[in-house]
Amino acid sequence: MTVMAPVVTVDGPSGAGKGTLCKALAEALQWNLLDSGAIYRVLALAALHHHVDISSEDALVPLASHLDVRFVAEDGQLKVILEGEDVSHEIRTEAVGNTASQAAAFPRVREALLRRQRAFREAPGLIADGRDMGTVVFPDAPVKIFLDASAEERAQRRMLQLQGKGFNVNFERLLSEIKERDDRDRSRPVAPLVPAADALVLDSTEMTIDEVIARALAYAREILA
C-alpha cells in the first residue's frame, strides 16, 4: 500500500495571515509548499509566455495539466518558480490577474489544476495554503488549520501593507471590499469558504504572527508525532 506524504492545510479568508504562516511552517518543517491562490496566475502567465489562446478551454487544459511550477519559502519570502524562472513579481501584474480570472471560468481548467495541486503532495510533506485545501483538495490531510481574523483587523493589516508600499488607501473602502469578498466566498455553491469539520480554528485577531506560528507549529507537531 502506498503511504501518502502528510499534508498540513491552512485555509481562511483573505488577509488572515495564511501566507505568512505557511511560509513559516514550510521553513520550520522543511516541507514542500503550495500556494493555491497563485496557481491560476501562474497558469495565466504561462499562457501569455507560450502565446496560448486564453479564451480556448481546449488550449488551456494541457498547459494546466503539465504546469511546471514550484513554490519556495526562503527567509520568510515566497518565491514562485515557473519553468525555472522566478516570476514572483510578474504574476502580480494586472494583465496576469485579468487573464487568470478568464482561465478560472473554465470547468476543465479547474479540474486540471485540482489534479496539479494534488501532485504537490510529495515527501517529506506539504504545506497547502488556500481556501478549500482541507475541504476539497486534501480532505484526508492529517493536520487542518482554519486561520481567521475579524474583517476590521484584516482591513487594518491590508491598509498598513499598502501604505508601506506608498499607496494612499481608504480604510472604510477596504473594509467594505473585504466584507463583500467574505460574503461571496462563504456563500458560493462550489467549495464555499468554511472550516473543515476536523480543523483547528485559529482566530488571529488578538494574536501576533509569532503567536500564530507557535500555536500552529505545536499543533502540527503534536498530530504528526
Curated annotation (Swiss-Prot):
Keywords: ATP-binding, Cytoplasm, Kinase, Nucleotide-binding, Transferase. The keyword Repressor does not apply. One of its GO terms (biological process) is pyrimidine nucleotide metabolic process. GO terms for molecular function: ATP binding; CMP kinase activity; dCMP kinase activity. InterPro entries: Cytidylate_kin, Cytidylate_kinase_dom, P-loop_NTPase. It catalyses: CMP + ATP = CDP + ADP; dCMP + ATP = dCDP + ADP. Pfam families: Cytidylate_kin. Its EC number is 2.7.4.25. ATP binds at G12, P13, S14, G15, A16, G17, K18, G19, T20. Signal peptide: none annotated. It is an enzyme of class 2 (transferase). It is found in: Cytoplasm. One of its GO terms (cellular component) is cytosol. Its main location: cytoplasm. Belongs to the cytidylate kinase family. Type 1 subfamily. This is Cytidylate kinase. The lineage of its organism: Bacteria, Pseudomonadati, Pseudomonadota, Gammaproteobacteria, Enterobacterales. The gene is cmk.
